[in-house]
Amino acid sequence: MASSSATAVPLTREQVVPSRQRIKLPAWLEVAKPRLIPLLLATTLGGMALTEGWPLSSPRLVCTLGGGALAAAAAGVLNCLWEQELDGRMQRTSGRALPSGRLSPTAAFAGAVSCALAAATLLVSGVNCLAAGLSLLGLCSYVLLYTALLKPRTTQNIVIGGVAGAIPPLVGAAAATGHVGLGGWWLFALVMVWTPAHFWALALLLRDDYRAVGIPMLPVVKGPVVTARAIRRYGWATVLLSFLGVWALPEGGLLYGLLLLPFNGRLLQMVERLGAEPDSTERAKGLFRWSILYLFGICLLLVFSRQSGAAVFDLQLRGWLAALPAGLPGINA
């Protein structure tokens, strides 16, 4: 097969994300996992755009995103603290800040507590208590539910534990209106079903690492064929659920739906290719990278569809579509 050469050597995380090779972060910043934060903030913005409270005032927007970034940083540090012994046993992760000794656990814990307190203060004082509480829930679910409880015990760890990454849209909705409406819950559900396909693509690439330390990721326990089938199911579920954004948006939904088509087409193409070649590292790597761009794109479309010009265009498009049947031969015959 054409992809046989791609299956010989499993890729490292650094090969999957080349920026890890180019950018060396200070130890105190490395443990905060800053590369994960932009996507969390993007889904927070998406949650805001799905409410009648959009756009937010600049101070509230800054406080929400700043608080969310600090809460995510605290969660990242606590995750590194919990897994430092595990990281030290794997060649790929043994050079990280905590297992290598470049940062002490005491300093890391102090940083995590400081970030969590700063996040809570910023969100309570600058946004509202619901947004602060949801951010704290996201932090706890990542560290306790996913990292400590589910990750070492079940192949479905990311399916259930994915709730941690799905909470930012709820934070965004709460920040905009003081409550979480149907739009926020829709984006929460979308991120939940997007997460397994995204993460299992990465786990296919790193399954030897997970196997070496006894972490029961799906590719380790069930193999690449079963994993590719599961990815396909969740990929299709993501596509189908994404179209509900047409109705979840207060305005601009039709424009969102039209612009969504190429994103979904590409996602389906990549999950089907992986299904045809489940052992291909290149297929898994491509899907992992595209899945990140896909979720960024969804959130960008949500925000774009709420701009005034986009809303006007959406109304014009709806009028044109409503008038279209009258111009078709035989419709009024």
Curated annotation (Swiss-Prot):
Subcellular localization(s) per the UniProt record: Cell inner membrane
Transmembrane segments: 36-56, 61-81, 107-127, 130-150, 158-178, 186-206, 243-263, 284-304
CDD domains: PT_UbiA_Cox10 (cd13957)
Entry keyword set: Cell inner membrane, Cell membrane, Heme biosynthesis, Membrane, Transferase, Transmembrane, Transmembrane helix
Transmembrane keyword on record: yes
Main location: membrane
Topology within the bilayer: Multi-pass membrane protein
E.C. code: 2.5.1.141
InterPro entries membership: Protohaem_IX_farnesylTrfase, UbiA_prenyltransferase, UbiA_prenylTrfase_CS, UbiA_sf
Pathway field: Porphyrin-containing compound metabolism; heme O biosynthesis; heme O from protoheme: step 1/1
Family the UniProt entry places it in: Belongs to the UbiA prenyltransferase family. Protoheme IX farnesyltransferase subfamily.
Further information: Carbon 2 of the heme B porphyrin ring is defined according to the Fischer nomenclature.
Protein name (database record): Protoheme IX farnesyltransferase
Species name: Synechococcus sp. (strain WH7803)
Lineage of producing organism: Bacteria, Bacillati, Cyanobacteriota, Cyanophyceae, Synechococcales
Annotated gene: ctaB
